[in-house]
Amino acid sequence: MAKNTSGRGQRDLKVKVKTARGRKLSSTRWLQRQLNDPYVKRAQAEGYRGRAAFKILELDEKYRFLVPGARVVDLGCAPGGWCQVAVKRVNALGERSDKRVGRVLGIDLQEVEPIAGAEIHQLDFLDDGADDRIKEWLGGKADVVMSDMAASSSGHKQTDHMRIIALCEAAAYLAFDVLEEGGTFVAKVLAGGAEGDLQKLLKQKFTKVANVKPPASRSDSSEKFVVATGFRG
């Protein structure tokens, strides 16, 4: 039998995308990256709504905050990948009869397609009284508040950094109001220098605060995630 020296059969071939008339080169590069991204392929194969699902999966593998019976709030939940992960991890559908049944509440400004096992509400979490409505929907306080939110990109790196830090701080203040003692806060940030104040804020309220870049986060992205555990109340 002839030896395979081309490398084919040893790994998946990369998909090359031609630049179509009217399509920008940047769009072509993005499409090519998507088509060759193993996390995109896994998301499609496993039924997740986006590759971001693997970020929360990897964070939970390390910190174990999505446990059966937990009550979870997902801020800015569209398109729903994080909710899908949470539903499975907290046993929201009661599929594991020997485990406690959790609850998953998704919050977003836009309408989100229904997710089995999750309760989705169209709400601006910055609205007055949003914290009370969330606790009412949950039937009590949350064990986990998580956010993969990002402000609309301005194209200016530092401006985008400041916007997402402000959004993360707003999410943190909501978490202070709705979290059960001992709870966990997880949120996306972009590196850029202003994380210090956010870290100080979270360290006042949580016993441990970590900055993590999970493997599913692209290496060329400045995103990372803050994981704050042990809410002091």
From Swiss-Prot:
EC number: 2.1.1.166
Residues noted as binding S-adenosyl-L-methionine in the record, renumbered to the chain: G80, W82, D108, D124, D148
Catalysed reaction equations from the record: uridine(2552) in 23S rRNA + S-adenosyl-L-methionine = 2'-O-methyluridine(2552) in 23S rRNA + S-adenosyl-L-homocysteine + H(+)
Protein name as annotated: Ribosomal RNA large subunit methyltransferase E
Top EC class, one word: transferase
Signal is among the record's keywords: no
Stored HAMAP family: RNA_methyltr_E (MF_01547)
Taxonomic lineage of the native organism: Bacteria, Pseudomonadati, Pseudomonadota, Alphaproteobacteria, Rhodobacterales
Alphabetized UniProt keyword annotations: Cytoplasm, Methyltransferase, rRNA processing, S-adenosyl-L-methionine, Transferase
Similarity comment text for this entry: Belongs to the class I-like SAM-binding methyltransferase superfamily. RNA methyltransferase RlmE family.
Keyword Cytoplasm: yes
